[in-house]
Amino acid sequence: MTILTYPFKNLPTASKWALRFSIRPLSCSSQLRAAPAVQTKTKKTLAKPNIRNVVVVDGVRTPFLLSGTSYKDLMPHDLARAALTGLLHRTSVPKEVVDYIIFGTVIQEVKTSNVAREAALGAGFSDKTPAHTVTMACISANQAMTTGVGLIASGQCDVIVAGGVELMSDVPIRHSRKMRKLMLDLNKAKSMGQRLSLISKFRFNFLAPELPAVSEFSTSETMGHSADRLAAAFAVSRLEQDEYALRSHSLAKKAQDEGLLSDVVPFKVPGKDTVTKDNGIRPSSLEQMAKLKPAFIKPYGTVTAANSSFLTDGASAMLIMAEEKALAMGYKPKAYLRDFMYVSQDPKDQLLLGPTYATPKVLEKAGLTMNDIDAFEFHEAFSGQILANFKAMDSDWFAENYMGRKTKVGLPPLEKFNNWGGSLSLGHPFGATGCRLVMAAANRLRKEGGQYGLVAACAAGGQGHAMIVEAYPK
């Protein structure tokens, strides 16, 4: 019997799994605050012989907004174009020096399936600049970035723009399969008799719309259900999840008020006011959060709207270059993009444990340990997902039985973890979050005086990603 197929109704919070995944209590608010930054000593650089250094010059994003708000009348390429335009203004990079543009997205608008190309043309890039779009669920922007890293490291390109976009306010809603088939057959009919025969087969239930799938294709389970079962399997309580969500919103509000979210660029929405900041940051109270009912597994689940990331519209873009090219153009890069790793697990049993599996692999590849990391930036799909990953990473038993490791991965110190908020509070436009994570790590390293950042994320399909970001010397 696997972790997540253990019967939910027989798995109380104080289950035998809690004994396996012993961890310091997370239900103490004082432990969920970000501690003041500590200046770190310079460590070794991760430069590798005969491999080009790839640097982040800068990165921007549109404000991340709750779906159905100010961006609801736009198309995805409008948001992507805004991110590209913001990047051009921020960096003053000549459009003609950009060799390639790569964007990530998840739910594609059929009119602009290659949204990277349409956005690039709309932003004024040359029609001679190639662009393509990738999709890898919540790590689509990560894939866009690492594809760019590969093109630069191999010498194919010097200058790449990588980013991502998602517009959840207007997802494609299709006719039913029966209606689509009928319309296609009618289009092929060559006589009135054939058309009348086909029309006679029409039934009113053909008009029922087909909404975008919210469940995993391979398992038929929604991510929220999986998060609820994961939290139960790792004995993560409702209170712990609510406290972590409150931490995320509180830290995001503090960072927003102090002007630390410098990657956000204003966006003048056509026909509306200029949007200048994320609108999903809403610090509440544990008392208010406790009033919410379970969102997925009812009535006993612990995942709610308050401790889950919300549907978000937004776009991001980053300028990445070969180090020698950036310096030749007079830029002062923000960070190096170093080793990265992609992983995959069983989507039924371990859908959201990508960070647990990817973290030790990327650390070993880079020759680092958890103690070397100064800034952790993990994607927060759900509070329960983050806390379950914490418990898995801090468990020798899990490492031995599920990861084939002799010892546990280790627990990220909360005082270094998502100090400016995360996806729970800032929002999660599926295709754009990866760039936000990397820029948060890069900006935190510069602000806090650290050297290494670790970015990690889970994704639909049971996949995950982790990357090492190294601060560029001041």
Curated annotation (Swiss-Prot):
Transit peptide region: 1-33
Annotated positions of the N6-succinyllysine modification: 72, 188, 190, 272, 291, 293, 332
Intramembrane segments: 173-220
Keywords: Acetylation, Acyltransferase, Disease variant, Endoplasmic reticulum, Fatty acid metabolism, Lipid metabolism, Membrane, Mitochondrion, Mitochondrion inner membrane, Mitochondrion outer membrane, Transferase, Transit peptide
One of the Pfam families matching this protein, by short name: Thiolase_N
EC main group: transferase
A GO CC annotation given for this chain: endoplasmic reticulum
Gene3D superfamilies (UniProt xref): 3.40.47.10
Catalytic machinery residues: 138 (acyl-thioester intermediate), 458 (proton donor/acceptor)
InterPro entries, sorted: Thiolase (IPR002155), Thiolase-like (IPR016039), Thiolase_acyl_enz_int_AS (IPR020615), Thiolase_AS (IPR020610), Thiolase_C (IPR020617), Thiolase_CS (IPR020613), Thiolase_N (IPR020616)
Annotated site location: Increases nucleophilicity of active site Cys: 428
Catalytic activity: an acyl-CoA + acetyl-CoA = a 3-oxoacyl-CoA + CoA; butanoyl-CoA + acetyl-CoA = 3-oxohexanoyl-CoA + CoA; hexanoyl-CoA + acetyl-CoA = 3-oxooctanoyl-CoA + CoA; octanoyl-CoA + acetyl-CoA = 3-oxodecanoyl-CoA + CoA
Cell compartment(s), UniProt: Mitochondrion; Mitochondrion inner membrane; Mitochondrion outer membrane; Endoplasmic reticulum
Modified residues (N6-acetyllysine): 72, 188, 293, 298, 332, 348, 361
UniProt-listed Enzyme Commission number(s): 2.3.1.155, 2.3.1.16
Gene Ontology biological process terms in this record: cellular response to lipopolysaccharide; fatty acid beta-oxidation; gene expression
NCBIfam families associated with the record: AcCoA-C-Actrans
Family recorded in the similarity comment: Belongs to the thiolase-like superfamily. Thiolase family.
Function text: Mitochondrial trifunctional enzyme catalyzes the last three of the four reactions of the mitochondrial beta-oxidation pathway. The mitochondrial beta-oxidation pathway is the major energy-producing process in tissues and is performed through four consecutive reactions breaking down fatty acids into acetyl-CoA. Among the enzymes involved in this pathway, the trifunctional enzyme exhibits specificity for long-chain fatty acids.
The protein's assembly and partners: Heterotetramer of 2 alpha/HADHA and 2 beta/HADHB subunits; forms the mitochondrial trifunctional enzyme. Also purified as higher order heterooligomers including a 4 alpha/HADHA and 4 beta/HADHB heterooligomer which physiological significance remains unclear. The mitochondrial trifunctional enzyme interacts with MTLN. Interacts with RSAD2/viperin.
Clinical disorder: Mitochondrial trifunctional protein deficiency 2: An autosomal recessive metabolic disorder of long-chain fatty acid oxidation, biochemically characterized by loss of all enzyme activities of the mitochondrial trifunctional protein complex. The disease phenotype ranges from a fatal form characterized by early-onset cardiomyopathy, cardiac failure and early death to less severe, late-onset forms with myopathy, recurrent rhabdomyolysis, and sensorimotor axonal neuropathy as key features.
Identification of the protein by name: Trifunctional enzyme subunit beta, mitochondrial
Source organism of the structure: Homo sapiens
Gene symbol of the encoding locus: HADHB
